[in-house]
Structures are given as structure tokens and as C-alpha cells.
């Protein structure tokens, strides 16, 4: 995929990166930033109808402050996003357009971020397979949005190495990572740890609990399991089932409109992750024998 994007980027005017509005930083792929750094970028915060509106505004302002970058939010219910996407791309590359110089746009995104659904909406037909299980998109395809506007699709790409632990949990909570790749109980505990600090009223309303902010994560998960009837023999809570309930309620926005990171938080996580990763790489290099 890296090779395919590298080849295509040479003849691309604008790169659209589709992000999950509930976790914009974590759903961005650092490899794309590296490969496309010289190209104008349109960041599309998809699923904004599931995200915290105030935090979406923070992220849009953050991306719009970056050079050569525009950002817009999209709702899943939006039926005519093509006009907004085309207009934003023309703002970024005003020198392109018309039959002699058609706009060439690359669209990228991690698995399950809603890229296939968006492409289907843009084209008005089932051009791409859709579903809610993280998976592999077919090979690159060209989609004509207007007589002078070509959109090139790419397979969904996850981080080559997830160096930010919190991002790994957020990606798993959102459904970007296949079920076999993570422990649901761990993910639910991380999710609850954040939600009880930032979205306590939503948790309390949904699960009919009080003072969740002061509860330990394991106690909170157990209390939710009991409230939701996730019980097994001996009237014990089935923590696996309770974890599945919490993750499902987040994904389906049953807990309300939630965003799992702000630009400031993500910046801190990334800085810490890069530091740890640099130390790890240095140790790894030290262990390798010197070449003669």
C-alpha cells in the first residue's frame, strides 16, 4: 500500500484524509503525513454526528491553522457531500480544473472510518464494499465525480506501528481494529477511565449510576455489567459481556456524542509515545552487532 500511495501521490493535486471525528488524531496515519507532506491536504472529520460538537470545532480549528490544510466535518446523514469536497479541493489547488487540467485527488483513511460509505454517497452507487467490521478495501480505483474531477481510492491503512498506547485503545474502541487484535475488557476499562473523567453525566444517565468519577475502573465496569444484566453463575458479573456492552454503547452513540481526544491531549500522547519509541529503537540498535 505504501508503494501504491507513493506512486499515485506524484500525480495528485490534493490528498483527502478521512478521519473519525471521535478520535481525529488517533485515526490519522503518520505514514500518510510522511508520504504526502508536500501536497495540499483536506482533512475530513467523518461521523461528526457521533462526536462531541464542541471538540469537533477544536479539531477543525487545529487543522485549519496548519499550512496547506483545510478541514471540514461530515455527517453520516449528509446526502450531498460532493459539492463541499469539490469546493474545498479547489480552494487548496485553485490552479487545477477544467478539461485540460482536471483535479486529481487521492482519498485515504484507516479501515472502517467510513470511506467506502462516503464514496458510495459521492457516486450514488455501490462503488465500494461497506460494512462495520475492519477489513481490506479492494485495489485502488478511479472515481469520476465531475468531468474535471477524479478521485483515486486506496485500501484502508492503519499505523505501521502504534506508538501511542492510548491511540491503540481508541482505535479498538471505535472499531478500526479487528476484534481478534485486542482484549475487549482492557479496551472497555481504558474507555471508562476516560469517560468517567470527561463524560461522567452520560455514563450516569445511561447506566443509572452515581458518582462514577470516583469509582475504580474495574468497579465501574462491574457495576455496569450488573445494571445491564451481564451475569453468569453465582450471580457474578460477566466482565467480558459487560465490556462488549460498553464498547457497543460507545460505537452506536447510545452514550451520547463523545470524542475521545482533544488536539492538546493527543499532542501530549504523541510526544510521550515518540520519546518512548525513540528509546526503544536506540536500545534495539545497541543490541545489534556492528557490521564489519
PLM region spans:
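Helix-rich effector regions associated with P-loop NTPase G domains
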Residues: 1-14, 22-23, 28-41, 48, ...
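Glycine-rich, N-terminal phosphate-binding loop of Rossmann-like dinucleotide-binding domains
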Residues: 19
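Canonical P-loop GTPase G-domain recognition
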Residues: 42, 48-109, 127, 229-231, ...
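Generic structural marker for isolated residues within well-ordered, non-membrane alpha-helices
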Residues: 60, 116, 221
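Short phosphate-engaging motifs
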Residues: 81, 114, 150
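Alpha-helical scaffold segments in soluble metabolic enzymes
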Residues: 84, 88, 117, 190, ...
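Short, well-ordered alpha-helical segments in soluble proteins
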Residues: 89-96, 111, 122-126, 134, ...
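Glycine-rich phosphate-binding P-loop
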Residues: 105-124, 128-130, 154
Amino acid at each position: 500500500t505504501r508503494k501504491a500511495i507513493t506512486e499515485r501521490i506524484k500525480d495528485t493535486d490534493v490528498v483527502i484524509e478521512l478521519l473519525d471525528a471521535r478520535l481525529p488524531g488517533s485515526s490519522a496515519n503518520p505514514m500518510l503525513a510522511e508520504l504526502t507532506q508536500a501536497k495540499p491536504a483536506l482533512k475530513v472529520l467523518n461521523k461528526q454526528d457521533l462526536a462531541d460538537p464542541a471538540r469537533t470545532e477544536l479539531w477543525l480549528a487545529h487543522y485549519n491553522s496548519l499550512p496547506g490544510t483545510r478541514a471540514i466535518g461530515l455527517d453520516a446523514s449528509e446526502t450531498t457531500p460532493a459539492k463541499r469536497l469539490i469546493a474545498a479541493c479547489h480552494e487548496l489547488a485553485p490552479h487545477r480544473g477544467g478539461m485540460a487540467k482536471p483535479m486529481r485527488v487521492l482519498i485515504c483513511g484507516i479501515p472502517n472510518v467510513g470511506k467506502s460509505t462516503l464514496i458510495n454517497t459521492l457516486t450514488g452507487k455501490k462503488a465500494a464494499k461497506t460494512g462495520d467490521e475492519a477489513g481490506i478495501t479492494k485495489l485502488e480505483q478511479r472515481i469520476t465525480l465531475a468531468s474535471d474531477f477524479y478521485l483515486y481510492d486506496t485500501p484502508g491503512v492503519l499505523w505501521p506501528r502504534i506508538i501511542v498506547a492510548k491511540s491503540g485503545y481508541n482505535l479498538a474502541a471505535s472499531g478500526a481494529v479487528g476484534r481478534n487484535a485486542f482484549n475487549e475488557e482492557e479496551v472497555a476499562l481504558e474507555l471508562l477511565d476516560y469517560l468517567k473523567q470527561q463524560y461522567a453525566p452520560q455514563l450516569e444517565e445511561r447506566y443509572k449510576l452515581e458518582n462514577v468519577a470516583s469509582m475504580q475502573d474495574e468497579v465501574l465496569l462491574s457495576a455496569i455489567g450488573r445494571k445491564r444484566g451481564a451475569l453468569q453463575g453465582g450471580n457474578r458479573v460477566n466482565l467480558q459481556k459487560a465490556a462488549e456492552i460498553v464498547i457497543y454503547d460507545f460505537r452506536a452513540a447510545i452514550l451520547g456524542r463523545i470524542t475521545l481526544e482533544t488536539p492538546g491531549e493527543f499532542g501530549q500522547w504523541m510526544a510521550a509515545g515518540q520519546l518512548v519509541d525513540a528509546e526503544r529503537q536506540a536500545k534495539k540498535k545497541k543490541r545489534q552487532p556492528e557490521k564489519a
